């Protein structure tokens, strides 16, 4: 019977794949933009709760990962009423804890007897938050289906999720086992049956997609009643179940977490009109998203710069700003760059416009450390990581509405898109879809990171071509500092100089796209030190401006028609 259901599920997935694929090529009619008031209603409205005056700080290194998972389920249950627990995972916790302290909260690292916080002293203190003093037992925190399904039970029934290794501890505290998953070899059919029975309990605008070894997000999922699953994209049968979950979500749903196969996963999410925010190691979100923030303005007022016709203009932009965990866990490349005060060069940083959801502290820190020369644009692809080539017109419209709303909220005016475009037919379809974003006054244009060629000129598949939509330019990456080894340690000064020499060979022409290049910097292979050396090797005929300035300059000086640079 299970095999028959699996076959039916696989057939359904194939039908969905074909239907969504055909729909992505239909041109669609670009409707009028939403009003400012209407835009405010399309952003995910997560429940907010007060933050307790006393914050219980659990030192993550003093409990094993299984016990830490149980504490995380308790953290989420408590945070439905009041955010009280912060688990110190290291990373950038120091800044977040200091921010809480500065806001008047007391940080408690031990109980009244001087004991560090563990299940033994947390459960008696917070037993009233656990439904019926019960727990759901799961095998361990290393098995995707076990930990995720246990947390889904926690979300629905309010029981603590407890691994086998911690069962004796909770039994000694008088807790009662309500359900046992630990002895069952779970597969997607168990998940599917649970999901079909309980799906109406979960939010429809958000999903958590999280492998077992990631410790983030599950507290937030319990607090906000978000369904958790994880499917390898190589498992086509299990993907049939995930496709059903995707299809049940509202348009432009937020997919939190991450995956093993980036392109396959983001393409699949995009086929259903959704977007991904990489956040598998985003910690304590059930508490942090409740921090009160001032209005955030990541943007800047920009006019077209005064141009020298003898110079070639480049904008240098760090990729991967869609990655919420990278930003919240230190944004190391950004902060390292601040040590190069003598550079005095404008660097553009992609940044998640919904970052306040995960860590307002990280947003505040980025703004505080921002050099006056630096600027922010959205990460790919606006509101989050999506591939609009895979979306139908109605899905692009909904996603563009959300993108405009998040950009208005964050003050950003230039967007980044990322996609895989294989041929001129795809380019024509893509160019039309850009009009959905360009219809909004607060979106001035954008840059496009185009695959293929991830390890020859990563994100530079568009070779600098420009698309105009509603008289706004969307300029594809013309060159990428992305080492073909994928290994930062393999980057040499000789290789960096070769890249600079290539840029030095580009022509000056302020009145055509030939005179402008967006240079992508891959943060996982090109360090700030390597970027500094690259800039030092650029000739006087190359001028660095921000992405915002480049978009303004192209808007003012380049004919408003789609074009490719010569000889690239």
Predicted ranges, named:
Residues 2, 6-201:
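Mature N-terminal, pre-catalytic/accessory segment of carbohydrate-active enzymes
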Residues 29-43, 56-70, 77, 85-98, ...:
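Acidic-and-aromatic substrate-binding clefts and catalytic sites of carbohydrate-active enzymes
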Residues 66-73, 83, 100-105, 138-184, ...:
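Surface-exposed flexible segments
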Residues 84-87, 135, 139-148, 152-214, ...:
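Metal-dependent polysaccharide deacetylase catalytic core of the NodB/CE4 family, i.e.
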Residues 98-113, 216-232, 285-290, 311-325, ...:
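Acidic/glycine-enriched edge-of-secondary-structure segments
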Residues 130-144, 251-261, 512-525:
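Short, hydrophobic/proline-enriched secondary-structure or compact coil segments at domain edges
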Residues 213-343:
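Non-catalytic propeptide/linker segments at domain boundaries
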Residues 249-250, 314, 319-344, 354, ...:
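Catalytic grooves of carbohydrate-active enzymes
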């Amino acid at each position: 019977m299970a095999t028959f259901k699996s076959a039916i599920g696989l057939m359904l997935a194939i039908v969905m794949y074909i239907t969504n694929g055909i729909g992505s090529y239909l041109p669609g009619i670009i409707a009028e933009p939403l009003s400012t008031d209407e835009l405010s209603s399309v952003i995910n409205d997560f429940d907010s709760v007060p933050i307790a005056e006393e914050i219980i700080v659990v030192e993550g290194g003093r409990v094993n990962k299984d016990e830490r998972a149980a504490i995380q389920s308790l953290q989420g249950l408590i945070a439905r009423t009041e955010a009280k627990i912060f688990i110190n995972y290291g990373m950038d916790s120091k800044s977040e804890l200091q921010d809480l302290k500065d806001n008047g909260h007391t940080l408690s690292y031990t109980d009244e007897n001087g004991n560090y916080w563990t299940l033994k002293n947390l459960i008696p203190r917070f037993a009233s938050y656990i439904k019926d003093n019960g727990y759901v037992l799961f095998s361990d925190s290393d098995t995707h289906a076990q930990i995720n399904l246990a947390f889904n039970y926690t979300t629905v029934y309010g029981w603590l999720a407890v691994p086998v290794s911690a069962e004796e501890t909770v039994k000694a505290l008088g807790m009662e086992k309500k359900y046992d998953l630990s002895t069952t070899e779970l597969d997607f059919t168990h998940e599917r049956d649970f999901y079909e029975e309980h799906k109406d309990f979960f939010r429809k605008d958000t999903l958590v997609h999280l492998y077992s070894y990631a410790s983030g997000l599950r507290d937030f999922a319990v607090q906000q009643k978000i369904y958790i699953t994880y499917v390898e994209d190589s498992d086509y049968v299990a993907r049939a179940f995930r496709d059903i979950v995707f299809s049940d979500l509202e348009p432009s749903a937020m997919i939190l977490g991450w995956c093993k196969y980036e392109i396959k996963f983001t393409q699949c999410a995009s086929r259903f009109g959704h977007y991904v925010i990489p956040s598998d190691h985003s910690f304590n979100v059930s508490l942090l998203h409740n921090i009160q923030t001032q209005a955030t303005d990541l943007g800047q007022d920009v006019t077209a710069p005064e141009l020298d016709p003898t110079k070639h203009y480049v904008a240098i932009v760090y990729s991967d700003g869609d990655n919420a965990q990278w930003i919240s866990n230190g944004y190391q490349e950004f902060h390292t760059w601040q040590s190069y005060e003598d550079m005095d060069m404008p660097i553009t940083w992609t940044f998640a416009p919904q970052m306040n959801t995960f860590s307002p502290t990280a947003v505040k820190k980025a703004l505080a450390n921002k050099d006056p020369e630096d600027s922010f644009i959205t990460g790919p692809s606006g509101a989050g990581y999506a591939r609009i080539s895979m979306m139908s017109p109605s899905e692009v419209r909904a996603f563009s509405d959300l993108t405009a709303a998040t950009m208005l909220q964050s003050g950003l005016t230039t967007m980044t898109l990322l996609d895989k475009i294989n041929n001129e037919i795809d380019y024509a379809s893509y160019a039309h879809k850009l009009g959905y974003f360009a219809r909004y006054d607060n979106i001035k244009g954008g840059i496009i990171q185009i695959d293929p060629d991830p390890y020859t000129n990563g994100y530079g598949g568009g070779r600098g071509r420009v698309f105009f939509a509603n008289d706004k330019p969307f300029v594809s990456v013309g060159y990428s500092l992305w080492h073909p080894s994928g290994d930062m340690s393999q980057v040499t000064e000789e290789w960096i100089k070769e890249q600079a020499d290539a840029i030095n060979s580009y022509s000056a022409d302020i009145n055509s796209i030939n005179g402008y290049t967006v240079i992508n910097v891959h943060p996982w292979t090109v360090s700030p030190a390597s970027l500094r050396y690259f800039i030092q090797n650029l000739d006087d005929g190359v001028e660095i401006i921000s992405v915002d300035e480049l978009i303004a300059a192209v808007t003012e000086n380049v004919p408003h028609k789609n074009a490719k640079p010569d000889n690239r």
